[in-house]
Structure formats: structure tokens, C-alpha cells
């Protein structure tokens, strides 16, 4: 069975790559991973035993859908794990905790459109017009959810099975995160996981989304977070460094949270690899 890992940015799977003793600038590395050709705006890797493929899509719907189309056509995985960072929408989650998505919600539009009343289409017979704002949802693959849940329980990894939400823009402030959690009954919010699951569902490929919490429900991300490029890699070091010089404490807390979330994802992958849950490491 072949497994595909999908994330939006290199930071989310950097530890997974580095634990394989592989670097993209080492042309003839004998490590676990090798780089593949990928669609413009994405980065793709593959384990040398061909058991696991990985694609970094970039953030947002358009990039995710384009990269997923390539992945499903080129790699044809048997199962997909959507991995990455997320903001908490409930006080029951701490930085570094994992959220196993039981149901994936998506809301179109901007934060001004997210009130549930605005998501109900106007009655066309009464002369109104259909609203563009929609609320959609996808159920997680039950078998994959059970497999991963069992693995994290046995290994003592902090996690929560819960619905998650995908929106079009970064949710940066604590007040909005808390409101989304209370309004829609979700525990985490991101920008990509719904689109990964939707593409996998159309192709008939089992998919599970696992998100690592990078900031709590009572925390507000630094303003710089909303100005970083959506590319899978590159273009973020300079702005982050400049912001860190001006606001060292805020940036130190943010980078520490990113490191905790990144390590949580890597720990999950180590557990899944060592337990051979998805036959990772075996030749097809």
C-alpha cells in the first residue's frame, strides 16, 4: 500500500524530512527521501523505497487543488494523510496537541460572511438571489481514523478527535477562533484540509486530516503571520527575521510553538512508520 503525505508548507514536515537524513540541496543523497518534479508552486518528495510520497501544496484552495490533481494522477496513492498546523478553537487543546478530524467543514467568503444566518440561501421564489457563501462538510474515512487513533492512544500522544474547519483566510485573533469554535462546534481551523479531503473523496482514495496545534484559542498570532507568502518554501525567513528584531519575545513564543507543532507531526509519523500501520517501508 502506498501512502501520500500532504501539507501546505515545508515547515510543517521539515522534521519528517530531516529525520530521514535528507536535504534537497544534496544532489546525490543516500537518505530516505528524494525530490520529485512537481507542478508549479508545489514541492514533491518520495521515499526511495516508493512506499510514501509527499507533496507540499502551498497554502489556500487554488494551490491545494492543483497539487492534489497532480498527486492523484501521478502517484496514485492508496491512502492520504493530510498533515499540518492549525489554530485551536477550544480551550481543551494545547500547543503541540494533535486533532484527528472526524468531520471537515468549509465556509466560503470572508470573516464578515461567517455568521450562520448568512450561510442560508435566500428563497429564490421570493425574488431573492442565491448567496455565494456556502457551508459544506465531509466525513473522515472511518477506517483510517480508527487506525491512527489507536496508534496515538497506545503511544501516549495528546490528541482530540473532533470536527475541523477550513476557511479562505488566516484566522489570527483569539476572539475569532473562540467564536468559530462555539458557533460551529469545531476544535481547529486551517486553510487546506477540506480541499485535500474533497479531492481524495472524488478520486475514491481514503483520507484523514491530522492537525498539530500551533497556537491556542486564547492567543493571537503576530501580525507578520498574515503577511507571509503562501508558497510551500521560501520567502518567509527575511520577514520573520525583521519582525523578530523588533519584537523578539513575540517571535520567540511563535517559533517555539511552531517547533512544538512540527515535532508533534514528526512523532506521529515515527509512530506510524515503526508500527507499519500503512505498510510504510515495504516495497509494493
Predicted regions and their residues:
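Short flexible/disordered coil segments
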Residues: 114-120, 155, 219-235, 271-282
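Active-site oxyanion-binding pockets that recognize sulfate/phosphate
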Residues: 134, 251-258
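Metabolite-binding pocket within alpha/beta catalytic cores that recognizes anionic/polar moieties
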Residues: 1-154, 187, 202, 273
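Active-site rim beta-loop-alpha module in soluble metabolic enzymes
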Residues: 120-124, 128-188, 193-207, 213-218
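Divalent-metal-activated hydrolytic enzyme cores
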Residues: 256-284
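Conserved active-site and cofactor/substrate-binding residues in soluble primary-metabolism enzymes
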Residues: 8-11, 59-66, 75, 139, ...
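Active-site phosphate/oxyanion-binding loops
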Residues: 98, 105, 163-179, 207-253
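Residues that form generic nucleotide/phosphate-binding pockets
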Residues: 19, 151, 183, 227, ...
Amino acid at each position: 500500500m502506498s501512502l501520500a503525505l500532504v501539507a501546505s508548507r515545508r515547515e510543517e514536515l521539515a522534521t519528517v524530512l530531516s529525520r530521514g537524513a535528507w536535504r534537497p540541496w544534496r544532489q546525490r543523497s543516500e537518505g530516505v527521501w528524494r525530490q520529485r518534479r512537481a507542478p508549479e508552486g508545489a514541492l514533491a518528495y518520495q521515499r526511495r523505497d516508493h512506499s510514501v510520497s509527499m507533496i507540499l501544496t502551498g497554502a489556500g484552495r487554488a494551490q491545494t487543488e492543483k497539487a492534489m490533481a497532480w498527486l492523484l494522477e501521478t502517484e496514485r496513492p492508496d491512502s492520504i494523510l493530510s498533515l499540518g498546523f492549525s489554530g485551536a478553537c477550544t480551550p481543551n487543546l494545547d500547543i503541540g496537541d494533535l486533532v484527528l478530524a472526524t468531520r471537515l467543514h468549509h465556509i466560503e467568503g470572508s470573516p464578515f460572511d461567517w455568521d450562520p444566518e448568512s450561510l442560508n440561501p435566500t428563497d429564490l421564489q421570493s425574488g431573492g438571489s442565491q448567496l455565494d457563501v456556502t457551508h459544506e462538510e465531509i466525513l473522515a474515512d472511518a477506517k483510517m481514523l480508527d487506525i491512527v487513533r489507536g496508534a496515538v492512544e497506545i503511544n501516549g500522544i495528546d490528541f482530540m478527535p473532533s470536527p475541523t474547519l477550513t476557511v479562505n483566510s488566516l484566522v489570527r485573533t483569539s476572539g475569532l477562533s473562540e467564536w468559530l469554535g462555539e458557533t460551529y462546534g469545531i476544535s481547529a481551523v486551517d486553510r487546506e484540509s477540506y480541499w485535500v479531503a474533497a479531492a481524495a473523496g472524488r478520486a475514491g482514495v481514503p483520507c484523514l486530516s491530522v492537525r498539530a496545534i500551533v497556537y491556542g484559542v486564547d492567543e493571537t498570532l503576530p501580525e507578520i503571520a498574515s503577511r507571509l507568502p503562501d508558497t510551500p518554501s521560501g520567502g518567509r525567513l527575511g520577514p520573520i527575521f525583521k519582525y523578530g528584531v523588533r519584537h523578539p519575545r513575540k517571535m520567540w513564543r511563535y517559533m517555539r510553538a511552531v517547533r512544538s507543532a512540527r515535532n508533534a507531526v514528526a512523532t506521529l509519523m515515527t509512530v506510524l512508520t515503526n508500527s507499519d500501520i500503512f505498510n510504510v517501508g515495504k516495497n509494493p
